């Protein structure tokens, strides 16, 4: 479910039936998210690690910005920490505000087409190279808009993912 938000940015409300933690005074958490695209035009999805909110849901890798970090710096740090990859070029692409029950999150999506290193799942997560429609389930709500944008760019028609049951 989406709604209007300040400055023309849309708001995606995840699990709208659940109560929001922190009420109206919640701060927005900025997150850098990497859309790693390989030579076969597949993108990388990772499962959320054990013990985290939305455990085992599939998402694009990334993490929270630390104080005084740019999106590019945060993404570079997070992908090295979580996946063991050194990224070369970050293209800031799109932004989506997501109202999760546990947090209000501004997702800063970046395309990454060049990196060094081998994938290492350093937080106990799984990974899958995917194309549309994605075959992994369940997909994190904040990931769904990206799948739609990728479909629009590539001319893909049809469901981008399987709905969670």
Regions found by a protein language model. Give the residues of each.
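Generic C-terminal helix-cap and adjacent flexible tail
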Residues: 151-165
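Conserved Nudix-box catalytic region and its N-terminal flanking loop in Nudix hydrolases
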Residues: 2, 42-81
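Short secondary-structure junctions
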Residues: 82-89
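Active-site-adjacent beta-strand/loop module that shapes the phosphate/pyrophosphate-binding cleft
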Residues: 38, 86, 95-119, 126
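Conserved N-terminal beta-strand and adjoining loop/helix that marks the start
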Residues: 14-43, 64, 95
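NUDIX/MutT-family hydrolases
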Residues: 111, 119-154
């Amino acid at each position: 479910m989406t709604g209007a938000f300040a400055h023309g940015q849309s708001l995606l409300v995840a699990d709208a039936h659940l109560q929001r933690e922190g009420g109206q005074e919640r701060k927005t958490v900025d997150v850098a998210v990497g859309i790693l695209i390989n030579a076969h035009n597949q993108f990388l999805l990772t499962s959320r690690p054990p013990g985290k909110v939305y455990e085992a849901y599939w998402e694009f890798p990334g993490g929270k910005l630390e104080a005084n970090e740019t999106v590019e710096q945060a993404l570079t740090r997070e992908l090295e920490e979580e996946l063991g990859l050194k990224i070369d070029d970050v293209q800031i692409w799109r932004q989506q505000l997501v109202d999760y029950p546990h947090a209000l999150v501004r997702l800063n999506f970046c395309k990454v087409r060049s990196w060094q290193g081998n994938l290492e799942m350093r937080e106990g997560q799984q990974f899958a190279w995917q194309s549309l429609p994605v075959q992994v389930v369940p997909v994190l709500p904040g990931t769904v808009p990206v799948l739609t944008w990728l479909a629009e760019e590539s001319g893909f028609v049809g469901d981008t993912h399987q709905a969670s049951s």
